[in-house]
Design a protein with these regions (language model features):
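Bacterial N-terminal signal peptides
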Residues: 7-18
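Short, compositionally biased
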Residues: 121-132
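C-terminal cap/linker of serine protease catalytic domains
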Residues: 21-29, 55, 70, 93, ...
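Small-residue-enriched segments and motifs
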Residues: 36, 58, 68-71, 125, ...
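Catalytic nucleophile loop of clan PA
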Residues: 37-38, 144-165
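Extracytoplasmic/secreted proteins, especially bacterial periplasmic and envelope-associated proteins
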Residues: 104, 122, 140, 160, ...
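Conserved active-site neighborhood of the chymotrypsin/trypsin-like protease fold
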Residues: 33, 40-120, 135-139, 147, ...
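Positively charged n-region of N-terminal signal peptides that target proteins for export
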Residues: 1-4
Length: 218
């Protein structure tokens, strides 16, 4: 799929001392946390909220080794979504599709950085079910989803983002069924995408602070 350049690898460094390198006490060590998708050329990235939960530092990297620190613009805990901002322009943004047109048994493509590996993983599958959780609508997909795919997009046949990977199903017995993962419709991200990062100085200060450190990748 030629649009994998739209993806980013989301890494975090938490406040916990266990994430700090033994030989670099003043440098946060980035832990692979999940995936994301570029939704605006000015540096806006959409991911899952649980990917960046409790993070002290957030930074992203593409498969082409472009790396940048990010700030959290806004979150939607109800739908497990988060919008990040990096200080750059001219990025290639993902085309956004119409989630309302997604139907049962529709072919989809998922993409992300499985297991925190730097190579993009692309899998094909179908919409196994369109379910509701309370008043929410979620897509059940049968594509292979692994740790690290959370926050990554699902594409329709036209290469448009129609959903964001959020979770795998876990049965109360502890059994994790194969081929049973969920994605939130991209339409739930509309309120987040409508917001802008107005505090430019905050991003500039944050970026400068990280650049003064020797930020390591785990």
């Amino acid at each position: 799929m030629r649009r994998i350049v739209l993806l980013v690898w989301v890494m975090v460094a938490a406040a916990s001392s266990s994430l700090w390198g033994a030989e670099q006490q003043d440098s946060p060590v980035g832990k692979p946390a999940g995936s994301g998708v570029i939704v605006h050329s000015d540096g806006y990235v959409l991911t899952a909220e649980h990917v960046i939960a409790n993070a002290k530092w957030i930074f992203v990297m593409t498969a082409e080794e472009f790396r940048a620190p990010a700030i959290l613009v806004s979150t939607d805990s109800e739908h497990d979504l988060a919008l990040l901002k990096i200080e750059t322009v001219g990025l290639t943004e993902a085309p956004i599709g119409y989630a309302g047109a997604v139907r049962l048994d529709q072919k989809i493509i998922t993409a992300g950085f499985s297991f925190g590996l730097r190579e993009v993983s692309v899998t094909r599958g179908r919409i196994a079910a369109v379910r509701t959780r309370g008043v929410q609508r979620v897509f059940q997909v049968d594509a292979a989803i692994n740790p690290g795919n959370s926050g990554g997009p699902i594409f329709n046949g036209r290469g448009e983002v129609v959903g964001v990977m959020t979770s795998k199903f876990s049965h109360p017995s502890g059994i994790v069924p194969e081929g049973m993962s969920f994605a939130g419709p991209i339409s739930y991200a509309t309120p987040l995408l409508a917001k802008k990062c107005r505090n430019k100085s905050r991003l500039t200060r944050y970026t400068s602070q990280i650049e003064r450190m020797n930020l390591a990748i785990y």
